[in-house]
């Protein structure tokens, strides 16, 4: 990816005014949509891979891992953890990688909405939970499509672990920080982020294009 990425344009000039009410409503009313069979099969495959590496090893989820570069980097940084990278696109997951997938990582094609709930239903606790450069859905009317505005969002609290979300859209991270504050009861802040070692192709492209990067982090226990 070359450094020619466009800046995000939105009519929003700050966190969505309806975010708090939406998050509180979702916290009060659990998401009940039936889980698709193919996602159950994908979840079983992920659990089998974890068991092969060692079920007692701490688990890291890279939610929306795209072409799979970030799970490689995370696995290298945490060799004593098992990393599950999940993306809904088999095309993205099948693209070439700079190195082979290590023994402590697996890439899974699944819908995150179902995968998160399956983790929670099975009582699985995450050590770390990454959400790197998700689709920002910048239109004002698309709040419920952003993860912080989605009905599945409260499940994150059940999964625990150290959560980190990054984006090149400041407002997205400000919203995520606000939503995570509501979810956790902690003070979560949006902060600028700079790195010389980009974790994903998008992060590399955004840096090369002169974008500001933002992140928020919280420990959900």
Regions inferred by a protein language model and the residue ranges of each:
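S-adenosyl-L-methionine
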Residues: 1-59, 69-76, 98-123
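Conserved SAM/SAH-binding beta-strand->alpha-helix loop
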Residues: 89
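Class I SAM-dependent methyltransferase "Motif I" SAM/SAH-binding loop
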Residues: 64-68
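Charged helix-capping and loop-helix junction motifs
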Residues: 144-152
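Conserved beta-strand signature within the Rossmann-like core of class I S-adenosyl-L-methionine
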Residues: 159-167
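Conserved beta-strand/loop positions that form the S-adenosyl-L-methionine
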Residues: 63, 86
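Class I S-adenosyl-L-methionine
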Residues: 172-179, 183-221
